[in-house]
């Protein structure tokens, strides 16, 4: 094993080549992708790189690890081919690309990289070819032949009609008066071109894509005797206007222009920086309901959030997006920016109508839908995009809609739609009060909630917060999705209807005929005061059916010894509040008797000591009650205390309760949880 540990690093170093055995500067993302392509191509010989080509196009990419295994770029299938890595060439009869390309001057190197059209236009000028062939050190970002061919006819005509001014200036804009390799091309930097010292914008993305004024580098670092050539996929042009100036020029941004002016963001958009503006057109604003749009435009904070949600923190050129990316806006929302073929998508929608409009301080993509952040929405608007539509309909039917559309600071606890699969409660005064208890009197964020915290509701109740290892619950209901924080209200999506506590544990047990025998046993064991006082208890409450299932002799023996009865009853009471949503695969809950109860939950079935819980989460002010149809016994190896005081009275009380149970159990009918809740509210 020790020998293997020494050999593995050596084997890896030999596989990666000499560069891997020496510490040096960190490789750029482009160089790392190129290295991966070289590793994938090495089976075909030295200096062979694997290249992925989009099927049906001429677009090629050096392959990174993710693209290699997925065989997709922008959701489209690719084919793998193998070609010489930059700077190498084939030798007849030899495997791979063993020979280093001979160096020539810049002009000749243009032909080597496949930019013969650039050579042709260079020949048409009087001054440029001698510079490219003469002494000096230059960098040329050379458009590919396809890039020149894709220029609009009127643009190309204007260039070639005046070759010694327009064409010469255009070519000089693609040049820098020093050698610049890809490891020097830093994200967000500007290079000074040889045309009037105009800036060229460089972006070097983590996925290895490098862009020059949003044109992608196709073949990089081709050395020449007097410089270096990088092949790019577009003809680039000078950039003179900032983002704000472009907004002022474009007629399609009339509404955006007014909104920016009202928000004061024009200072940001005309200042220094590198941003991406997802610029909504006039039509995008017109798609929004007038009431919503007027509300946002009239609210300075909501308006600023709206506009900031259209600004990314860095310049993102379209060519840099080859798969889905999560990008944060200035507002703080994360947008999913992706691509499908040649189309860019925002949150999965192809809403970008024009891309890569360059500005001196970033790039603009035109969009035809407005991106309204949660922070600019009402609770109603938040709920419309969430899985809580049934609950929101209940609030509206109960006449509580104004709370969800106004400027009241609230947190809405909205049960998800699946809670109501068996139907919804009838709207009456009690239901309305129940719904009011799903509204907290403050705008909260779940990340600030803590165990034992109490929350005041519009219905006048105090709700408790329970924090468990894998869940966060408010009374019996647990948060089922991330918060949605709106302009004034926050939406919590809950996994069930919330049950406010209606009394102590003893009040709950006394108010339910199913527990008459248990109540009698508690009274005879002297535990009434315990379950009435302030505390945090979880009670696994045996029903009358559970007691009646005990053999008569065992039942009489149990009831004939008050101390043993108290010991067993204490074993049914945990010393903390554990609602069903807080139960994981297994929770060991310490009982008041001293031993631990094993509580688990699987597929919505809660068990205690492997016995099923018939009904969970009956909330009390000092705990929670879970109904069980069995009597639990402490572990047999723990000696039970014995005694016979109060035995006669205990047995008598129990007999009376048993008789009462037989008389009433036929009339007890299990109802849906929310109906039972409404019944408890009568007491």
Swiss-Prot record:
The keyword Protease does not apply. One of its GO terms (biological process) is extracellular matrix organization. Induction: By TGF-beta. Residues 45-99 form the EMI domain. Disulfide bonds join 49-85, 74-339, 84-97, 214-317, 473-478. One of its GO terms (cellular component) is extracellular space. InterPro entries: Adhesion/Biosynth-related, EMI_domain, FAS1_dom_sf, FAS1_domain, TGFBI/POSTN. The modification Phosphoserine is found at residue 37. A motif (Cell attachment site) lies at residues 642-644. Keywords: Cell adhesion, Disulfide bond, Extracellular matrix, Gamma-carboxyglutamic acid, Phosphoprotein, Repeat, Secreted, Signal. Its main location: secreted. Residues 103-236, 240-371, 375-498, 502-632 form the FAS1 domain. Residues 1-23 form the signal peptide. Widely distributed in various tissues except for the brain. High levels in corneal epithelium. The modification S-cysteinyl cysteine is found at residue 65. It is found in: Secreted; Secreted, Extracellular space, Extracellular matrix. Gamma-carboxyglutamated; gamma-carboxyglutamate residues are formed by vitamin K dependent carboxylation; these residues may be required for binding to calcium. According to a report, does not contain any vitamin K-dependent gamma-carboxyglutamate residues. The EMI domain contains 2 expected intradomain disulfide bridges (Cys-49-Cys85 and Cys-84-Cys-97) and one unusual interdomain disulfide bridge to the second FAS1 domain (Cys-74-Cys-339). This arrangement violates the predicted disulfide bridge pattern of an EMI domain. PROSITE patterns: EMI, FAS1. It comes from the Eukaryota. Coiled coil: none annotated. Plays a role in cell adhesion. May play a role in cell-collagen interactions. This is Transforming growth factor-beta-induced protein ig-h3.
């Amino acid at each position: 094993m020790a020998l293997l540990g020494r050999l593995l690093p050596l084997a890896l170093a030999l596989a990666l080549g000499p560069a891997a055995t020496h510490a040096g500067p960190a490789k750029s993302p482009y160089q790392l992708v190129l290295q991966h392509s070289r590793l994938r191509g090495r089976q075909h010989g030295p200096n062979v790189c694997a290249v992925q080509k989009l099927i049906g196009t001429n677009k090629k990419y050096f392959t990174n690890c993710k693209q290699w295994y997925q065989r997709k770029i922008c959701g489209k299938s690719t084919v793998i081919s193998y070609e010489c890595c930059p700077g190498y060439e084939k030798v007849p009869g030899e495997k791979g690309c063993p020979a280093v390309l001979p160096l020539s001057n810049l002009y000749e190197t243009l032909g080597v990289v496949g930019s013969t059209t650039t050579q042709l236009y260079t020949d048409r000028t009087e001054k440029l070819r001698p510079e490219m062939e003469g002494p000096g050190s230059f960098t040329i970002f050379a458009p590919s032949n396809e890039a020149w061919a894709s220029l609009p006819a009127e643009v190309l005509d204007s260039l070639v009609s005046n070759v010694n001014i327009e064409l010469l200036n255009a070519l000089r804009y693609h040049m820098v008066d020093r050698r610049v390799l890809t490891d020097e091309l830093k994200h967000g930097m500007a290079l000074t071109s040889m045309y009037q010292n105009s800036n060229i914008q460089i972006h070097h993305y983590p996925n290895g894509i490098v862009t020059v004024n949003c044109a992608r580098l196709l073949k990089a670092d081709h050395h020449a005797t007097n410089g270096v050539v990088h092949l790019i996929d577009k003809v680039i042009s000078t950039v003179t206007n900032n983002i704000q100036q472009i907004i002022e020029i474009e007629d399609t941004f009339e509404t955006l222009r007014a909104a920016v002016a009202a928000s004061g963001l024009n200072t940001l958009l005309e200042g220094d920086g590198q941003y991406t503006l997802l610029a909504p057109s006039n039509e995008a604003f017109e798609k929004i309901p007038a009431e919503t749009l007027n509300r946002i435009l009239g609210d300075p904070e909501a308006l600023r959030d709206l506009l900031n949600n259209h600004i990314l923190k860095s310049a993102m050129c379209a060519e840099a997006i080859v798969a889905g990316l999560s990008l944060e806006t200035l507002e703080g929302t994360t947008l999913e920016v992706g691509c499908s073929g040649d189309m860019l998508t925002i949150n999965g929608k192809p809403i970008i109508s024009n891309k890569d409009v360059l500005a001196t301080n970033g790039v603009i993509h035109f969009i035809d839908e407005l991106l309204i952040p949660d922070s600019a929405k009402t609770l109603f608007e938040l709920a419309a995009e969430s899985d809580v539509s049934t609950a929101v309909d209940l609030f509206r039917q109960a006449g509580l809609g104004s709370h969800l559309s106004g400027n009241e600071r609230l947190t809405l606890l909205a049960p998800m739609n699946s809670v109501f699969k068996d139907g919804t409660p009838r709207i009456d005064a009690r239901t309305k009060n129940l719904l009011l208890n799903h509204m907290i009197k403050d705008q909260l964020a779940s990340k600030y909630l803590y165990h034992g915290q109490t929350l005041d509701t519009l219905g006048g109740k105090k709700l408790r917060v329970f924090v468990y290892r894998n869940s966060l619950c408010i009374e019996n209901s647990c948060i089922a999705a991330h918060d949605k924080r709106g302009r004034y209200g926050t939406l919590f999506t809950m996994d069930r209807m919330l049950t406010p506590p209606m009394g102590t544990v003893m009040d709950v047990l006394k108010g339910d005929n199913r527990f008459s025998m248990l109540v009698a046993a508690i009274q005879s064991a002297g535990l009434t005061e315990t379950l009435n006082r302030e505390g945090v208890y979880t009670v696994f409450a045996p029903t009358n059916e559970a007691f009646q299932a005990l053999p008569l002799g065992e039942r009489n023996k149990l009831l004939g010894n008050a101390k043993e009865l108290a010991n067993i009853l204490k074993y049914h009471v945990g010393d903390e509040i554990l609602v069903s949503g807080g139960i994981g695969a297994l929770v060991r809950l310490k009982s008041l008797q001293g031993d631990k109860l094993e509580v688990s939950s699987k597929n919505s079935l809660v068990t205690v000591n492997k016995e099923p819980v018939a009904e969970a989460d009956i909330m009390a002010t000092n705990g929670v009650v879970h109904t069980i149809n069995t009597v639990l016994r402490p572990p047999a190896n723990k000696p039970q205390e014995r005694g016979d005081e109060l035995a006669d009275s205990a047995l008598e009380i129990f007999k009376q309760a048993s008789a009462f149970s037989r008389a009433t159990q036929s009339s007890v009918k299990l109802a849906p949880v929310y109906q039972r809740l409404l019944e408890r509210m009568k007491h």
